[in-house]
């Protein structure tokens, strides 16, 4: 099959592993003709280019700047012009190709202003991987307070979702939320596609050497949060947990990554003398996994104000590395993700976000019981191996393509 992927990012390093890159690599590995379209921000001072990377063609389209910039006006202008930039260059460079399917993801590159013209031009269906439910998630945590602005984005959301032939959700909670709150959607279009990863064997690491490199001793108990430090995570709740744990000198907290809230969090740590917290900037993937594997607990955090189900993607990394998870979750996520984590996989524990004493009690269960940590970590690893391989994601999508073709054929016949 000829597959057109449209991704907001696509690493040029063939050894990098990300959700989107792993998926396109798998489609290519399975014998499909793969083309990836992705952004090439103007800050890199390069023009639009089409070249082979890792065996298949990648079209990098010059756009405005979006990632890791503080200028909201510039970011907004990039979003407004992105669809037309991408559409123009896709037609210019790929217009003579035949595609059987378009696959993209939220946010930003999924707008119907891009997808509808491409569907019509290439005469093929489009599948959406739904990673966030915007604008409701932004309203929940106070990013959008204006009623008119919220209504505008809800209108845009309806136009976007209606453009797709399949909407692929990360969890049963996402599926149920869409079915209950989006009456205009055909329920048969909404399907489950769990996050995925390349299945790799457990690798032995020198735990003491890695810990020493980053200033930790072998006998310390390290809880790690890796990933985006933004408003949705509300990492103040983890700071409160760290403050509650200050008396125990063996307990340490490690934050790895970047994000819009990182600077503010570092300031809070300094102001409150939270000497048990360490921040590390984003590191290469291989180093991140080694650091994470040398820790004792993986942390997940979500703002308690959320009313939409979220499924933290870092879960797959923790499962992969046999790391037990402690999650601070809003009520909506507790019913979906929390139940999945604690009762289905049995790969971790959770408490409701904002209940610091409840979170601390769950944390101390893990601290005091090495056997429990090992059991939870092994359960997560087992689930990862059985259900979260990128090959499973590939099979899910291919099965949906088969069903879509069958329905399309029936419509033509009758």
PLM segments and residue spans:
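Conserved donor-binding/catalytic core segment of Leloir-type glycosyltransferases
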Residues: 217-233, 238-242, 254
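N-terminal subdomain of nucleotide-sugar transferases
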Residues: 1-57, 245, 409-414
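Helix-loop-beta element that forms the nucleotide-linked donor phosphate-binding surface
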Residues: 162, 168-169, 174-197
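A short, well-ordered alpha-helix in the C-terminal region of glycosyltransferases
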Residues: 358, 365, 372-386
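A short helix/loop element that forms part of the nucleotide-sugar donor recognition site in Leloir-type
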Residues: 48-51, 202-216
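Membrane-proximal helix-turn-helix segments that form the acceptor-binding/catalytic region
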Residues: 117-121, 148-169
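Nucleotide-sugar-dependent
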Residues: 14, 233, 284-293, 298-319, ...
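Nucleotide-activated donor-binding/catalytic signature segment of Leloir-type glycosyltransferases, i.e.
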Residues: 248-250, 254-257, 262-289
